[in-house]
Amino acid sequence: MLQEQVSEYLGVTSFKRKYPDLERRDLSHKEKLYLRELNVITETQCTLGLTALRSDEVIDLMIKEYPAKHAEYSVILQEKERQRITDHYKEYSQMQQQNTQKVEASKVPEYIKKAAKKAAEFNSNLNRERMEERRAYFDLQTHVIQVPQGKYKVLPTERTKVSSYPVALIPGQFQEYYKRYSPDELRYLPLNTALYEPPLDPELPALESDGDSDDAEDGRGDEKGKSKGTSDSSSGNVSEGEGLPEGQEEPLPGRQRPRDKAAAPRKDAPKRSALSKAVPGHKPKVIPNALCGICLKGKESSRRGKAEPLVHCSQCDNSGHPSCLDMTMELVSMIKTYPWQCMECKTCIICGQPHHEEEMMFCDVCDRGYHTFCVGLGAIPSGRWICDCCQRAPPTPRKVGRRGKNSKEG
């Protein structure tokens, strides 16, 4: 609104001084020319400075301080709107009279098909726009942004039907949902006491201990380490007076297998497999020009200065003299009957895992590795220890004839 016209309509001489807080600005030259073309202002007013006011502020001022003027102004606006609608209707009726055409009855079905086709195209475009451009919308009543729900596969009704006892509400109550555990799974659960430790990933590399610590543990006797010994259950199966072949030393209690310090670091070995019994027809591995990992000599000479064949690991390229590995002749003949593993590749026969080296012990007859917790032992036994695969049959007792009543006593 123009400030000059408002002040004239309200009868206020100095409108700017009376209402200085109203927002106002000066009209540009183009705006004055536009108002002159609409006959809103005169040519004299076009040369003068004119000021524009905000319409909403002026109407609020009229409602508060000039209610009579505002009522008169509202009536004038309604008359103008009514006149505009009437003029628009007259123009529309004149256009209809000028463009009046008679529609043939035979073309009505064609027009109906065209109208239906256009309506279908409009609906398809509207739905496509909703799905691509306006998927989410803001709900003015709840002030929540509504997002379309994703598509999910629906199961058949019989698969999702709830039973009469779906879940126990109190401890000990019957329910139809339960899990059946296999014997191997139950060994990991603490029913009375868990028999197995948490399973380890077989693909994880085994932790290798330092070689210096192995040498230090060799002289500790029955202390922790990869020692071999006899448990109470198997100590009676081997006689203490049983002799050993000449040239072989009796293994010390609690001894450990010396690690191959000078051997090259082994590469990624293939997946290990548990070997519980001798493999029929097994042929030992043959590596020409192999060197012992301890004394760094071939089969022509050992650390004792004698020619001695080497034993080879079935998993890697490590080799060693039986005397350097503290092996007896019986043990050497036994390890040739199955794929023998060196200390670097040794795995448990029961679980097939190389982990928990501090709990690994070895049979004194076949040199197979076992975890203490896999065979039900709480700790590594001291002395000699023999696995179940190598347990010897107990000696058959000799039959002694009964003495008669008339027998003589010597």
Curated annotation (Swiss-Prot):
It is found in: Nucleus. Residues 199-208, 228-254 have a biased composition (Low complexity). Residues 257-271 have a biased composition (Basic and acidic residues). It holds the Pfam family PHD. Residues 1-207 are annotated as: SAY. Its main location: nucleus. The modification Phosphoserine is found at residues 182, 209, 213, 239. Keywords: Isopeptide bond, Metal-binding, Neurogenesis, Nucleus, Phosphoprotein, Repeat, Transcription, Transcription regulation, Ubl conjugation, Zinc, Zinc-finger. PROSITE patterns: ZF_PHD_1, ZF_PHD_2. This is PHD finger protein 10. It comes from Bos taurus. The gene is PHF10.
